[in-house]
C-alpha cells in the first residue's frame, strides 16, 4: 500500500525527501509530488504550499492521481497545550477549523455547512504514531485536538479567541483540517503529526523563524518511524 505524506513547505519535507530512493518528481498546479521508497515502503511525498486552499488542492491531486491508501500530514504548529514546549509533538485525535463560524445557522463554531464539526484521525494510524513515539524517547509526544485556520497566531487577542472557542486545542496551524476534510470526503484514513515551532500569541513569529527547522526535524523523525512500523 502506498503512503501519502504531505508537508506545506520545503523545510517540512526536505528531510524525508533526502531519504527517498528511486525518486520521481511530478509537479501539478504548483504542487510537488515525490514518488519513491522510504525504508522499503512506497511513498508519495507532497509539498502542498501554505494554507487551507493549497492543502486541499494538493491532497485532492494526491488522492486522485497517486491513490495512496493512507495520508500522514507532517509539519510545524503553534502550541496551545500548556504542558508543551517548542519541539514537542502533537498526534491528532481529531481536527477542526478554528476560523469558520456558521453558528447563525445552528452549526457548531468551526463547523462547515453539511460537514461534521470535527474530522477524527484514523485510530490505527493514531496507534501506529503512538507506538512509534514510544521508541523515540527524546521527543515528548501527546495526542490531542489540532485546529486549522488561515491565520498565523502572532496576535495574543486572536490566540485567546481561538483558545476560548476550542479550550481542549493542543496545537494550531494552517493546513491540517483542509487535508482532513479531503481525506474524509475520499474516505481515506489520515493522521496529523505536528511539532511545535512556537507558542501561539507569544512573539510566535520570531519563534517560528528560529525553531521551524527543529520542529520540522522532529515531526519528520516521528513520521519516518511511523512508516517503518506500518504493514
Swiss-Prot record:
Keyword annotations: Amino-acid biosynthesis, Hydrolase, Methionine biosynthesis
EC annotation from Swiss-Prot or TrEMBL: 3.2.2.9
Similarity field: Belongs to the PNP/UDP phosphorylase family. MtnN subfamily.
Top-level class of the enzyme under EC nomenclature: hydrolase
Organism: Psychromonas ingrahamii (strain DSM 17664 / CCUG 51855 / 37)
Active site per the UniProt annotation: 12 (proton acceptor), 198 (proton donor)
A family per Pfam: PNP_UDP_1
Job of this protein: Catalyzes the irreversible cleavage of the glycosidic bond in both 5'-methylthioadenosine (MTA) and S-adenosylhomocysteine (SAH/AdoHcy) to adenine and the corresponding thioribose, 5'-methylthioribose and S-ribosylhomocysteine, respectively. Also cleaves 5'-deoxyadenosine, a toxic by-product of radical S-adenosylmethionine (SAM) enzymes, into 5-deoxyribose and adenine.
Pathway in which the depicted protein is active: Amino-acid biosynthesis; L-methionine biosynthesis via salvage pathway; S-methyl-5-thio-alpha-D-ribose 1-phosphate from S-methyl-5'-thioadenosine (hydrolase route): step 1/2
GO molecular function, one term: adenosylhomocysteine nucleosidase activity
HAMAP family: Salvage_MtnN
Gene3D superfamilies in alphabetical order: Nucleoside phosphorylase domain
Substrates-to-products reaction catalysed: S-adenosyl-L-homocysteine + H2O = S-(5-deoxy-D-ribos-5-yl)-L-homocysteine + adenine; S-methyl-5'-thioadenosine + H2O = 5-(methylsulfanyl)-D-ribose + adenine; 5'-deoxyadenosine + H2O = 5-deoxy-D-ribose + adenine
Amino acids binding substrate: 78, 153, 174-175
GO biological process: L-methionine salvage from methylthioadenosine; L-methionine salvage from S-adenosylmethionine; nucleoside catabolic process
Protein's UniProt name: 5'-methylthioadenosine/S-adenosylhomocysteine nucleosidase
Cellular component annotations (GO), alphabetically ordered: cytosol
